[in-house]
From Swiss-Prot:
This is Large-conductance mechanosensitive channel. The gene is mscL. Homopentamer. NCBIfam families: mscL, PRK00567.1-4. Its main location: membrane. The chain crosses the membrane at residues 19-39, 79-99. Belongs to the MscL family. GO terms for cellular component: plasma membrane. It holds the Pfam family MscL. Keywords: Cell membrane, Ion channel, Ion transport, Membrane, Transmembrane, Transmembrane helix, Transport. GO terms for molecular function: mechanosensitive monoatomic ion channel activity. PANTHER family: LARGE-CONDUCTANCE MECHANOSENSITIVE CHANNEL (PTHR30266:SF2), MECHANOSENSITIVE CHANNEL MSCL (PTHR30266). The keyword Secreted does not apply. It is a multi-pass membrane protein.
Length: 133
């Protein structure tokens, strides 16, 4: 029973799709961290500077309810997350477009077909006849 499960898992794990997916998840996670850092540490401070030294991390709205309790809406962090999402989405779009262009080039290449057994035999006979002349 356990041996069958292990064998089935090996077959699944060795398939290209499972390995490709695992590599994609790891690379995607690392790429997400890079883009998050780009947005938080470079883009948003520059945008904040252009908008009059606004710090997006601290942008918030405090709402007081009727009973006096306060709710803080941190919309600055939300704006950063939206910019983060847009950059990641656009980067993935460009990457997929690049991969698709490579696939199209591969599809456009004419495939050289392997000669059949008969064609190979005829070519050998032709070569022998040329040599005998």
């Amino acid at each position: 029973m356990f041996k069958d499960v292990v064998e089935e898992f090996k077959k699944f794990a060795i398939k290209g799709n499972a390995i490709d997916l695992a590599v994609g998840v790891v690379i995607g996670g690392a790429f997400g961290k890079i883009v998050t850092s780009l947005v938080q540490d470079i883009i948003m401070p520059a945008v904040g500077l252009l908008l009059g030294k606004v710090n997006f991390k601290t942008l918030s709205l405090t709402v007081t309810s009727i009973d006096g309790s306060e709710i803080v809406l941190k919309y600055g962090q939300f704006i950063q997350s939206v910019v983060d999402f847009i950059i990641i989405s656009f980067s993935i779009f460009l990457f997929v477009k690049l991969i698709n262009s490579f696939k199209k080039k591969e599809e456009e290449k004419p495939k050289v077909e392997e000669p059949s057994k008969e064609e190979k035999l005829l070519a050998e006979i032709r070569d022998i006849l040329k040599e005998s002349k």
